[in-house]
A protein has these predicted regions:
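Intrinsically disordered, low-complexity intracellular terminal segments
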Residues: 146-151, 155
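Membrane-interacting helical modules
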Residues: 51-53, 92, 96, 127, ...
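Post-HExxH zinc-binding segment in Zn-dependent metallohydrolases
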Residues: 114-147
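Soluble non-cytosolic domains of exported or imported proteins
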Residues: 88-92, 96, 112-117
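Active-site recognition of the HExxH zinc-binding catalytic motif
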Residues: 95-108
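Auxiliary, metal-adjacent structural segments of Zn-dependent hydrolase domains
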Residues: 2-81, 85-90
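Pan-zinc metallopeptidase signature
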Residues: 158-209
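Flexible, surface-exposed loop/gating regions in the mature catalytic domains
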Residues: 110-112, 153
Length: 209
C-alpha cells in the first residue's frame, strides 16, 4: 500500500470515527469530529493536499504539515498544502498522521484560532489515538506535553465511556496546562505561532485553504 493510501486508511478508519471533542477559544469553542479529518481525506484524493516523505525536518520534528511552501536545504521546494510523514503503518505513526491532518484541516477550513491552541488540540488528537489503539504509554507519553495531552484525553475518554450526549469539552484545567506546556517547549517556544506568541498574542498559522 502506498504512503498516500495508508494515510487515507487512517483518516477514514475506525479510530478517527470515534474522535470528537470541543475546546475553548475566546468566548466560543472549536469542534473536532470525524468530519474534520474527512475534509483532509477528500483533499488528498483530489490532489489539493499532497503526502510526501520528509528529507530535512528539524531535529525533534517527526512530521510536518506545510501550510505555505518551504525551501529544503538543497534548494528544492516543498509545495504548500504538503503533509510530510515517514510512515502510517504503526500505531504511533498513525497517531502522528492524525496530528498533522488536524493542522491540514484547520488550513483547508480556514479556521480562526491561535497557533498554540492549534498545536495543543493536535496533541489531544494524538493522545486520543494512542489511547484508543492501546499503545503502551511509555511509548508515547514520555515528555511534559505528552503527559498533559494524556490527561486531557483521559477527561474526554471518561465522558465517552459514560455515554455523555453531544460532543464533550476538554477539561479546562487540563487544557490550559497543556497549552502552557506547548508554549514553553523548546520546539515551539519562540519558533512561531505554536509557542508563546500564539498563547499570549494570538499569532496564527496560515489558514488560506
Amino acid at each position: 500500500m502506498t504512503l498516500k493510501n495508508q494515510v487515507l486508511s487512517v483518516l477514514e478508519g475506525p479510530v478517527i470515527a470515534r474522535i470528537r471533542f470541543r475546546f475553548p477559544i475566546a468566548a466560543s469553542h472549536v469542534t473536532i469530529a470525524p468530519q474534520t479529518f474527512h475534509v483532509v481525506a477528500r483533499a488528498i484524493r483530489s490532489g489539493r493536499v499532497l503526502v510526501r516523505v520528509p528529507t530535512d525536518l528539524a531535529t525533534g520534528v517527526a512530521a510536518q504539515y506545510n501550510d505555505v511552501a518551504r525551501t529544503r536545504l538543497n534548494g528544492t521546494v516543498v509545495q504548500a498544502n504538503t503533509m510530510e510523514v515517514n510512515a502510517a503503518s504503526g500505531r504511533l505513526d498513525q497517531a502522528t498522521v492524525a496530528h498533522e491532518s488536524l493542522h491540514a484541516a484547520y488550513d483547508l477550513l480556514r479556521t480562526g484560532l491561535d497557533g498554540n491552541a492549534e498545536e495543543a488540540s493536535a496533541y489531544v488528537v494524538t493522545a486520543l489515538y494512542c489511547r484508543m489503539t492501546g499503545l503502551p504509554r511509555p511509548t508515547w507519553a514520555n515528555g511534559l506535553i505528552w503527559a498533559q495531552a494524556a490527561l486531557a484525553a483521559q477527561t474526554l475518554l471518561a465522558q465517552y465511556q459514560r455515554g455523555s450526549s453531544g460532543i464533550p469539552m476538554v477539561g479546562n484545567d487540563e487544557w490550559m496546562t497543556l497549552r502552557q506546556s506547548v508554549a514553553l517547549h523548546p520546539v515551539y517556544r519562540f519558533a512561531g505561532p505554536g509557542g508563546v506568541f500564539g498563547l499570549l498574542a494570538g499569532s496564527q498559522y496560515t489558514h488560506d485553504g
